[in-house]
């Protein structure tokens, strides 16, 4: 399965961002890919002051553009995330489209990014956004895939539940910052890959030091052994990676962590 991560620069103009996403996806799809992945808030500055103004309802123009791109290019498209407004509430939402442009998944960020690091980053998504309430795993011709957004990925229970629901790859549109990125970005993607014996794919916006929130960049792919297969730099970049899904099965046979769990002693429970 060949994936393309679009680590794009995000401007203050929504239409410009949508056009740029299309340009970069068309550029890489010409070489043949199966899945395109955009970053968190790819069409909106990551700023509480912007989320409402840039938001759109379910089926809005940005979503229509993503659907059309997936159909035009014949790819699965993980549309990063964008501000969605439904029933007066704002969500940080990722939409997924199949090769025909049909929406096959929607993930609303479950864990809102509320942090205040001494001498570092301060941000409170809960000032404007509401949390989602669903764990997201979707089917493809390559098997089930998991999807979460940025801060969601820090919670090991969520990754494990997606794994137990069959996910073979965890796709994570994310915008870590210059406080948390250098400290935790690579560590977390390797850790989740090793713990759950699957591929992890983190796709960030490009770094913009003039923005009110500076993304770390360094989009990353790790395999089920924790090996970093690909890592971008800080600027705008397209990263194409071939995922050998048989590698996942081999690692799980050789080091059978999931089947060795003592579910008679411990287990995860969810309330639906």
Report each predicted region and the residues it spans:
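Short beta-strand segments enriched in small/hydrophobic residues
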Residues: 1-8
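Short, glycine-anchored, charge-dense loop/turn motifs used at functional sites
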Residues: 3, 96-104, 222-230
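Cys-nucleophile CN-hydrolase/nitrilase-fold catalytic domain and related Cys-dependent amidase chemistry
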Residues: 14, 22-106, 115, 176-196
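Short, acidic/polar
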Residues: 16-27, 154-160
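CN hydrolase (nitrilase-like) catalytic-core segments centered on the catalytic cysteine
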Residues: 58-78, 144, 150-239
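Short beta-strand scaffold segments in enzyme catalytic cores
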Residues: 79-80, 93-96, 136-138, 219-221, ...
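Active-site catalytic loop in hydrolytic enzyme cores
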Residues: 85-165, 178-187, 254-257
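A short C-terminal boundary segment appended to hydrolase-like catalytic domains
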Residues: 246-272
């Amino acid at each position: 399965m060949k994936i393309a991560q679009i680590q794009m620069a995000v401007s203050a103009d929504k239409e410009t961002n949508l056009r740029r996403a299309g340009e970069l996806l068309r550029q890489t799809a010409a070489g043949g890919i199966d899945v395109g992945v955009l970053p968190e808030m790819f069409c909106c500055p990551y700023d509480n002051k912007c989320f409402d103004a840039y938001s759109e309802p379910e089926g809005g123009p940005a979503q229509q553009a993503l659907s059309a791109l997936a159909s035009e290019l014949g790819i699965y498209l993980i549309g990063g995330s964008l501000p969605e407004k439904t029933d007066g509430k704002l969500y940080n939402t990722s939409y997924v489209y199949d090769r025909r442009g049909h929406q096959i998944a929607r993930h609303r960020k479950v864990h809102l990014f509320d942090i205040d690091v001494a001498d570092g980053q301060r941000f409170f998504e809960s000032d404007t956004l509401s949390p989602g309430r669903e764990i997201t795993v979707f089917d493809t011709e390559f098997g089930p895939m998991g999807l979460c957004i940025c801060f969601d990925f820090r919670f090991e229970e969520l990754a494990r539940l997606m794994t137990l629901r069959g996910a073979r790859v965890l796709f994570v549109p994310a915008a870590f910052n210059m406080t948390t990125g250098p400290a935790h970005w690579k560590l977390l993607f390797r850790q989740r890959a090793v713990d759950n014996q699957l591929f992890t794919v983190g796709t960030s916006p490009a770094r913009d030091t003039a923005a009110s929130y500076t993304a770390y960049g360094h989009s990353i792919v790790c395999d089920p052994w924790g090996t970093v297969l690909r890592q971008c730099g800080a600027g705008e970049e397209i990263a194409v990676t071939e995922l050998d899904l048989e590698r996942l099965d081999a690692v799980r046979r050789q080091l059978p962590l999931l089947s060795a769990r003592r579910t008679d002693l411990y287990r995860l429970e969810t309330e639906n």
